[in-house]
């Protein structure tokens, strides 16, 4: 009976333990960097939710590579949230500003097993150099 109570408690409390992290889509951050996400590398746990919030017009979120082949593209100027249930690295960008390096990574559950997939993902302009730098920062 004690075992069953423990199992039930874990399942009941699990959603309470999940976090909601906010990432802002910025034209400019406090250091003067233009077209950036407020958190370029977010480290979260399975079950956590990330909410992207546009602070200016013209931004969105488009998933480019992920461990579960997640296809997602938000509408411009809209707040959007995704709950991450699959461990691994997720790579996303702001579609209108991808060439300016407006990208981000999410590491779910500390799992870096798809780092090669992310390293080889499509990138160009400033994005290519920035993606390489962000991936290197994970090791």
Residue locations for each model-derived region?
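Sec-dependent signal peptide recognition
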Residues: 1-9
């Amino acid at each position: 009976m004690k075992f069953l109570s423990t199992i039930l408690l874990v399942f009941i409390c699990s959603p309470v333990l999940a976090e909601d992290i906010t990432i802002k889509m910025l034209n400019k951050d406090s250091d003067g960097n233009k077209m950036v996400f407020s958190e370029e590398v977010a480290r979260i746990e399975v079950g956590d939710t990330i909410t992207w919030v546009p602070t200016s017009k013209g931004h969105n979120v488009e998933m480019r590579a992920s461990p579960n082949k997640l296809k997602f593209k938000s509408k411009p100027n809209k707040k959007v949230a995704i709950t991450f249930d699959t461990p691994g690295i997720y790579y996303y960008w702001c579609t209108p500003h991808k060439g300016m390096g407006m990208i981000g990574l999410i590491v779910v559950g500390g799992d870096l097993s798809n780092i090669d997939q992310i390293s080889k993902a499509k990138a160009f302009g400033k994005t290519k150099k920035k993606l390489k730098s962000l991936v290197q920062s994970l090791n």
